[in-house]
UniProtKB/Swiss-Prot annotation:
HAMAP family: Ala_tRNA_synth_B (MF_00036_B)
Residue positions binding Zn(2+): 562, 566, 665, 669
GO-annotated cellular components: cytosol
One Gene Ontology term of the molecular function aspect: tRNA binding
Domain remark from Swiss-Prot or TrEMBL: Consists of three domains; the N-terminal catalytic domain, the editing domain and the C-terminal C-Ala domain. The editing domain removes incorrectly charged amino acids, while the C-Ala domain, along with tRNA(Ala), serves as a bridge to cooperatively bring together the editing and aminoacylation centers thus stimulating deacylation of misacylated tRNAs.
Major localization listed first in the record, in broad terms: cytoplasm
Matching PANTHER family: ALANINE--TRNA LIGASE, CYTOPLASMIC, ALANYL-TRNA SYNTHETASE
NCBIfam families from the UniProt entry: alaS
Protein name: Alanine--tRNA ligase
Amino acid sequence: MKSAEIREAFLRFFEEQGHTRVASSSLIPNNDPTLLFTNAGMNQFKDCFLGAEKRAYTRAVSSQKCVRAGGKHNDLENVGYTARHHTFFEMLGNFSFGDYFKRDAITFAWTFLTSEQWLNLPKEKLWVTVYATDDEAYDIWTKEVGVPAERMVRIGDNKGAPYASDNFWTMGDTGPCGPCTEIFYDHGPDIWGGPPGSPEEDGDRYIEIWNNVFMQFNRTADGVLHPLPAPSVDTGMGLERVSAVLQHVHSNYEIDLFQNLLAAAAKAIGCSNDGQASLKVVADHIRSCGFLIADGVLPSNEGRGYVLRRIIRRACRHGNKLGAKGSFFYQIVAALAAEMGEAFPELKSQQAHIERVLKAEEEQFAKTLEQGLRILEQDLAQLKGDVVPGDVVFKLYDTYGFPMDLTADIARERELTIDEAGFEREMDAQRERARSASAFGMDYNSLVKVDSATEFLGYDATEGQGKIIALYKDGQSVDQLGEGEEGVVVLDRTPFYAESGGQVGDTGFLQAGAARFDVRDTTKTGGAFLHHGVVTSGALVIGSPVEAKVDADVQHATSLNHSATHLLHEALRQVLGEHVQQKGSLVDSQRLRFDFSHFEAVKPEQIKQLEDIVNREIRKNTPVETELTDIETAKAKGAMALFGEKYGDTVRVLSMGGDFSVELCGGIHAKRTGDISLFKIISEGGVASGVRRIEAVTGAAALAYLNAAEEQVKEAAQLVKGNRDNLIDKLSAVLERNRQLEKQLEQLQAKAASAAGDDLSNAAVEVKGAKVLAARLDGQDGKALLALVDQLKNKLGHAVILLGSEHEGKVVLVAGVTKDLSSQLKAGDLMKQAAAAVGGKGGGRPDMAQGGGVDVAALDQALALAVPFAEQGL
């Protein structure tokens, strides 16, 4: 069976057993900061197992894409060198949320694996493990399924602590846990290894293909296991492993999924396809890189982006090792999309984007790869012992972009190891330097702990009545705030919007009788809204009723900018591609700032396209509509959700232009798109690797920006004695005239230099049969001095020349040595001495060198070095 057929058979089998087919979740875990990447099928169901989320089904089946290449689950260094380690793999899984338990889970697994209708694996090839004390599972396997006792293995606490076992699963030190049962396939006696639980279990003969986890306990802090009221099941079967079994091969790299990728990799690199480890690395890495980029990850220097960069660069290095010339890695994306695009359509829809990102990263790394490898080879040649020092590993990382594991990979090929501890010390020192150079403000919200929640009135009003339920000063709870005191006011009800989703918090004032509190900002902690500000008159007391009034003009201007960010977000996806994801935003009354994932600068013509699309939607003047619904319904309607945002059971869906823009958003917005009036982008640039930023203005601010630009055009026209209509022609004429004058000036300078050369040649002194000339020609630039040195070398014939000039407040130096002397005297060596004398640097070829410095007063002293330099070298 082909891998695609196995995947579909698994999903169809469990659908027939009443399971709901659930699509693979993103490789970016949603709302789980503990995970770098999705690494198991159960990740997307974590809240279901914890009881925090209820879904419309209690049985589920999925084929989950997974990555293990960072953090705790890191297989990167072994990939390519073993039969089963991968950065990307598919986990087939069936799940029960308080529905069926051990008997059904075991029966389902055995039926699918062994029945003729499905995989038809020989039963005598299958071994089973259970947790040592799980008699229930053992009896089901032996008495009901019929697995003989000689192929059953009980596994106890083999990891040095209670319940620390290969056959006991825990989510952490406390929480849901339970025993598991695993199914192993015996590849036969011609492969070394022993059954699970034996001393030889790490061999490759017996390979785990299925794991059933039975979540039946809750472990408390005292280590006691308490039965869960509704036990659940989490299972996993690696698609690559079971494909190897069914296709009668031992290594995962021999299955159909990899054969086409290996062939494509060999073709792109220009090498043979004969099982080299480096080729396996490339074939594996194209899968993880392709899927990560499709899910919105871009190469960067931190977090998920850095893991992606590490994988790409490891693949590039292995391709380079196989003889690749130029960029090759991106060329394999087409084969990946052809192989897996039916099951994962994002590979096809984003193929061009994935290729562009990989090609750009390859080209960037190529600039430093060769130089970095050369430096590493030099360091390894001088190495005493078999450990590469941490400072060498850090230098390669910091200067040449070599991730630590890439250097470790190269060291491994030479039977060397790296000093990881030393590398981490260097990294810590760098982080400390960065911390010392930064100043961090206090997070005031973290000081304020409020149990009560605030009812928000602001979607429908900018004024409202509330009651003071808490007061804070300097982070401490107080009973009252007096005149002139700064603090935080918490109300039971408020029309003030709290900073969220990039929109700044509202400003305004609170009135409590004679007391007034000017609100300078509004934030939120938990469900409480914090009004930050100062008492300008009277005193505020807990329990007092207040009149809350938002600065409606400021809020209105802010709301227009917020609505414009939604239109811009969709426009970006239309113009640049669906890979664009919001990475951050700041929306206030003056302008909007929108950060998004993209790998290159936005072109001027694309900026115009973005403005045209947004302004077209503004002119349509369609209503801005909101709807409260559940998260699944919202996503089914195409609503975009932001990665990392936590959404409750009920979400607010905001639609603009019908279905032009549909996003989950709790912010304040325009009533109609026409309220925005006008949209104008004022800047675009990069803020981090793979992240771009657009700043824009709307409405009156956009009009003011255009008016200011119009005034600048008028002023420019006046300067060239023209008008708006002929400004371009006038400017072109001025620039052309300037170019002509510069050319004439260069010609005059060349003539002057030539004349000076005739005079200077007479000033040369003879040193051991050679002519040595050192001269100062202030006002000449480097280009003029170079031409003059060439002229003097021809005139003098057998010479050492050093010329210097004070030019625009700095020292310019040029040194020359005729070729007949360049084996004895190097112009670059002379330049290093002279440049150092004027506080600068320089270097070059043996016959010609350039340099400079900042110490003009030392120029004559530097020129005086020419004669002793020649005397010592000749």
